[in-house]
Amino acid sequence: IRQSGGLIGCGGFVQPCRSDLMPSRPIRLTSLAASAFLLTLACAAQAQTPVTLTEAMADPDWIGPPVEQAWWAWDGQRVQYQLKREGAAIRDTYQQPIAGGGATMLDGAARADLDAPRAVYDASRTRMAFVRNGDVFVRDLRNGTLTQLTRSNADEATPQWSSDGNLVFRQANDWYQWRAGRGVSQAAVVKAEKDPAAPPKADDLRERQLAMLATLKKDKETRDAARDQNEAWRRADPTRAPAPTYLGTEVVVADSALSPDGKWLLVVTTAKGADEGQAGKMPKYVTESGYEEFEEARTRVGRNDPLPHKLWLVDVAASKATELKFDTLPGIKDDPLAAMRKAAKQDPLKGDRPVRIESDGDGSGPAIHWSDDSRNVALLVRAVDNKDRWIAGVDLANAKLVTRDRLTDKAWINWGFNDFGFTRDGALWFLSERSGYSHLYVNDGGKSRQLTSGKWEVSTPTLSPDGATFFFTCNRKWPGDYEVCAVPVAGGDVREVTSLDGVEDFTLSPDGSKVLVRHSSSYMPPQLSVVNAAGGNATQLTDTRK
């Protein structure tokens, strides 16, 4: 599809489309089907060259593939991105220099040197870690050396650096750490099992057996002494893995987040055997087998609420777990549905409202974020009734939650605009729709400072490498015009970095000097451009249209 004066698919025909029939403003669209619909409306009266049914109804290959995902190579001089292969479901990876020149498809052994999206950087900005094909890699940014930390059929995820160079990552609910020169070691293990060292429940018969039969008593004392000695050796030996932490048999581990220094673990659990409700079954009649098949869908609305969560703070060295109660959250006992319950003649709510620690938007892990120095942690707690969202910290010394922000809405808390994290100096930043629009706030322990304001939205905030500037997506001109914007962490004017009229997403270069932008328009599938972080004209890197 050409943006202006080119080939446009129109109601089953292909021909140049008059610009006066086109919408006057660009629209942010990620769906080519939606673009085709708009084009059909604009050009329905024009008909010359027939289009095949495949082109008109489904397959956008004839238009050209959109850039689906893009990231920086380690040196900041090249970008890597994925394109759909024509006529197939395969996604190929290409590499292109930003200084000019064509793209090269990376195939075969060349793929072993690929970088990956969502890389995380150490405090000195000399190394980055990322996950590729489920394995963890570390790249030295001084010379490009790539070190593979894991090579397994399991999926590792969520790497994070500590301020002193320790890297932690997870494999399911097991946590590992890596430090240069020491290799990979297990950092924390939590099990939903009975602690073998825990005393059994009181039982008169058992007590009489031990009191009357000296052999049984001696055997028990021998076992206990051997176990205690082994645990003492484990704690004193730095080459040993940490002992498991046992949460008991009444819970199921749903998620967890380890502090970068490996000392603390936050664990999210649900009740074992809890009824999630029967899921709906969607019948599929056109199948390879020739027989009808059923696909499991979500639990039907109104059947069962999402399972409530419990939260535990684990001292990894001591293998001790303490439940963090939610009763310190303001409004947790208030029932926003009290009037409806009364009208329906239902019993009033008793105790605290059920809550969940929801996953991050990208599905990478729970909405729990540690600061790089492991001194601070924040988590997003959401009421199951969707009327409240809290961002809470944890008092690690006293094992209790401390509320940092509360957002309440009688209608519904948005599933989006819930990003949060920490600045370089340990202040909490977060998005909130308290004003009616998503805006950026910073809280350093007192009253929150609002960095952005107006009848527009902030999304996907990212800190610059020096920690001085937030970059984010904004739509200040009108709701459909998305750009990359920036604002100082200390406060100040918001500036627009791009003028592309349709930013989909962006990524800062490793040194923070440039921004890789994926953008589209009504008649152009997502493409890549690069712009200086200080602003200026964008340099377009790709044009995948035919």
Regions found by a protein language model. Name each.
Residues S31-A42:
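Bacterial N-terminal signal peptides
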Residues W312, Q540-K546:
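N-terminal cap/lid segment of alpha/beta-hydrolase-fold proteins
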Residues L528, A538-L541:
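Blade-level signature of beta-propeller repeat domains, shared across WD40, Kelch, NHL, RCC1
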